[in-house]
């Protein structure tokens, strides 16, 4: 009789454990549908905007999951006429078409407290790898406005008004 009870308990556990484990595991794992990484430096003399401006650097890394969730972080060191302003925060929007990406997120830290709570956005073009690709990677400077403008930038994926060759560093854009 004791042997029968042990067999019955073993059968019971073998039937219950797989369903318990299946219930504990997520039904589906969100897969990565897009990824961007970059660390870019750009220096422009006064002939472009009337004053020397420098992106030194714009650094970011983000992924977009199949459920639309975007995860990542960005930081930006911007110099205008030698005066540095810093911005950083999470990345909340990302759109990828081919080798181009539109990226943005809220400013949660800045050396200019008036910018905290605003949004920042930029566009990049991944033109290959290596220290000297035939066509360099390209980036815009960061635009700053409302969080609604930031999301609209990613949603509409506009052509850039100004986009510049990355002089040092690089970008990586991938879908899937």
Spans of model-derived segments:
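Tryptophan-anchored aromatic micro-motifs
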Residues: 28-50, 105
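Short, surface-exposed loop and linker segments with low hydrophobicity and enrichment for Pro/Ser/Thr
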Residues: 21-33, 63-68
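Generic low-complexity segments that are intrinsically disordered, proline-rich and/or Lys/Arg-biased
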Residues: 3, 19, 27, 47, ...
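Extracytosolic low-complexity repeat regions of secreted or lipid-anchored proteins
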Residues: 100-165
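Predominantly extracellular/secreted and cell-surface proteins with exposed
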Residues: 47-124
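Short, low-complexity, Pro/Ser/Thr/Gly-rich segments in the mature regions of secreted, periplasmic
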Residues: 165-176
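Secretory targeting and sorting signals
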Residues: 1-25
């Amino acid at each position: 009789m004791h042997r029968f009870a042990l067999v019955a308990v073993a059968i019971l556990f073998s039937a219950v454990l797989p369903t318990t484990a299946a219930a504990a595991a997520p039904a589906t794992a969100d897969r990565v549908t897009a990824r961007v990484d970059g660390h870019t430096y750009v220096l422009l003399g006064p002939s472009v905007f009337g004053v020397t401006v420098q992106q030194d650097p714009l650094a970011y890394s983000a992924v977009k999951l199949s459920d639309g969730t975007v995860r990542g972080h960005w930081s930006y060191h911007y110099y205008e006429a030698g005066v540095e302003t810093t911005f950083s925060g999470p990345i909340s929007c990302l759109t990828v078409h081919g080798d181009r990406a539109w990226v943005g997120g809220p400013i949660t830290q800045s050396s200019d407290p008036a910018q905290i709570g605003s949004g920042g956005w930029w566009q990049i073009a991944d033109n290959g790898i290596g220290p000297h690709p035939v066509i360099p990677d390209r980036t815009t400077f960061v635009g700053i406005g409302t969080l609604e403008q930031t999301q609209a930038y990613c949603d509409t994926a506009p052509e850039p008004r100004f986009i510049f060759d990355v002089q040092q560093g690089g970008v990586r854009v991938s879908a899937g």
